[in-house]
Regions:
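Conserved glycine-rich cofactor-binding loop
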Residues: 34-36
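Conserved NAD(P)H cofactor-binding loop of Rossmann-fold oxidoreductase domains
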Residues: 100-104
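Active-site helix of classical SDR
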Residues: 131, 168, 176
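Residue(s) in the substrate-gating loop at a strand-loop-helix junction
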Residues: 151
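Short, small/polar-rich loop/turn modules that mediate ligand/substrate recognition or access, typified
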Residues: 184, 189, 254-256
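C-terminal substrate-recognition "lid" of short-chain dehydrogenase/reductases
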Residues: 232-261, 266
Length: 267
């Protein structure tokens, strides 16, 4: 983990010994669960007693979750017909976690039509498809919790070379608030997570690109860490713990909020 050795941290202790929530008897759907933050959410939800339905575009990563007790299936969340079919055959869920995302690097001058459309298809449309398919089941269950992955790079803060990504993630926050207001009387809560820089496979892919410019992977890692006020990158479990809380009854008074978890970036 890319941490600052001078700063004491207890990240490894983020498990049920230090963060106790109860998801027993709750059925939780999670997209992009095969790696990174999605995997951490699935693992933590399983540890909290949930019945986890983990999906991803690829089988890789899902196999370990299956061995831990999750019900797994490959699913293209950009295909509305496949989403409708999946939810028509699934039980009524208590929680929905939309984790899928794609980062385009570039200013608006670097964004072509396909980049723009793909950014919105993966980052926003997929959530629209999933939420629309899931709400009837949530209503039948008397309510539930939806958590959408947004980003600090959104309406929260501007970042260089994130034009398409930031626009799509700002729209996620808007969708989240609309769903929260429209279905509050049905007992459905909807929140968004706006992480800062989290150490995931996706981030390491971006580090590899940066390494070509800076000369080495180590230099790229140091560059990413140097931008963090806490002197380290965030870890997937630090996001998963908040999402697990929001899925649980402990988070029952929270809705319509973009939760910022950024290591002090905009403090």
């Amino acid at each position: 983990m890319l941490l600052n050795p001078r700063i004491k941290t207890n990240i490894d202790a983020i498990n049920l010994r230090s963060f106790i929530v109860n998801l027993t008897d709750k059925k939780i759907f999670i997209s992009a669960a095969g790696a990174g933050m999605g995997y951490s959410v699935a693992k933590m939800a399983l540890d909290a007693g949930a019945e986890v339905y983990a999906t991803d575009l690829k089988l890789e990563g899902l196999e370990e979750l299956k061995s831990l007790g999750a019900k797994t299936e490959t699913l293209d969340i950009t295909n509305e017909n496949l989403i409708q079919d999946y939810f028509s055959k699934s039980p009524n869920f208590n929680g929905i976690v939309n984790m899928a995302g794609w980062v385009h690097h570039g200013s608006i001058l670097d964004v072509n039509k396909n980049d723009w459309r793909n950014s919105f298809l993966i980052n926003l449309d997929s959530m629209f498809f999933v939420i629309k398919a899931a709400i009837p089941g949530l209503k039948k269950n008397g309510g539930g919790s939806i958590v959408n992955m947004a980003s600090l790079a959104s309406s929260v803060k501007g970042f260089p070379f994130r034009a398409a990504y930031s626009a799509s993630k700002a729209a996620v926050i808007g969708l989240t608030k609309s769903v929260a207001v429209d279905f509050m009387s049905d007992g459905i809560r909807c929140n968004a997570i706006c992480p800062g820089t989290i150490e995931t496979p996706s981030l390491h892919e971006r580090m590899d690109v940066m390494a070509k410019k800076l000369g080495s992977k180590k230099a790229a890692e140091e560059w990413f860490v140097s931008r963090q006020p806490m002197g380290r990158l965030g870890q997937p479990n630090e996001i998963a713990s908040l999402i697990t809380y929001l899925l649980s009854d402990a988070g029952s008074y929270a809705t319509g909020q973009p939760f910022i978890v950024d290591g002090g970036t905009i403090a």
